Amino acid sequence: MLPYVTHDPRFSQLVIGHANLEKLASGCRWAEGPAYFAAGRYLVWSDIPNDRMMRFDETDASVSVFRSPSFNSNGNTADREGRLVSCEQFMRHVTRTEHDGSITVLADRHDGRRLNSP
């Protein structure tokens, strides 16, 4: 028996038969937007209501706060150079976290108007 319920049979095509679910962290109120960084062997995700981003380090199974405040980040991904790209709802822009930890705003306007919670 699977440790989860599926509502669409197509989901089974996405799951590797021998893969196991593993709880990585607790205390998140709304965890979403995972982005995996293979070179660093870590996973980053957003905990939107707690206004933070979390990080799971695969090498030692530790969980830590990656960024707080996160400005209600969401929609995370890794770019081709291994940098984090996020949509920050509160600040209404799309950012990139550089390798040195600095943050670059990639977009905050379209047609001269502010983005609306990207």
Predicted regions and their residues:
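Sequence-structural signature of mature extracellular/luminal beta-sheet repeat domains
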Residues: 1-118
